[in-house]
Amino acid sequence: MRRPTLLMLALLAGCGPDATSEALPLGLDITLSRAVASQVGAYQVAVLKDGTKRNCTELQRTCLSSQVSSSDLLELKDADGNSGRTLRFPSAPGGAAMGLSVDVPVGRDYALVIEALTADTPTRFLGSSCNYLRVVNSGTNATLVAAPIELTTQSCDPVFSR
């Protein structure tokens, strides 16, 4: 069963010429339809290098972990100082809008993937949104409305090996 879910992202991010080790905040505002809110337990955020070489349609079909190597992902950091190549954020109660802050390295040509994950154990993939980030600047960036998530339960494991 497929249900489109609108995932909204406001990008307020990181600068400059090419990718550097400097990471600056990327703000994400996520809104989820209340109709599917009870199914979603968390969002997993990942940013891929070489975004224009990626096919977002293909990346959204199944777990990102089954399609790319963890070395293709940028190192991210959340507002609490947790870091990793993927970051997980619990969904807001009742599907309420939520704001996230993720430090993304300054640079160009990225693909941002947000996976909706179940609250079950083990965690299962529900669907994802993929968006191209042409440039992450040091100032305020234009707001991005993310591609809708098509909820399609898959049997893949969304966890990247560490």
Where do the model's predicted regions map?
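Post-signal peptide N-terminal segment of mature Sec-exported envelope proteins
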Residues: A23-Q44
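Bacterial signal peptide processing site
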Residues: G16-A19
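C-terminal motif of bacterial Sec signal peptides marking the signal peptidase cleavage site
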Residues: L12-G14
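Tryptophan-paired
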Residues: K49-L126, Y132-A146
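One face of beta-strands
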Residues: L26-I30, I114, G127
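Residues that cap or initiate secondary-structure elements
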Residues: R34-S38, G51, R108, D120, ...
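Compositionally biased low-complexity segments at domain edges in trafficked proteins
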Residues: I30-A35, S138-R162
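Sec-dependent signal peptide recognition
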Residues: R2-M8
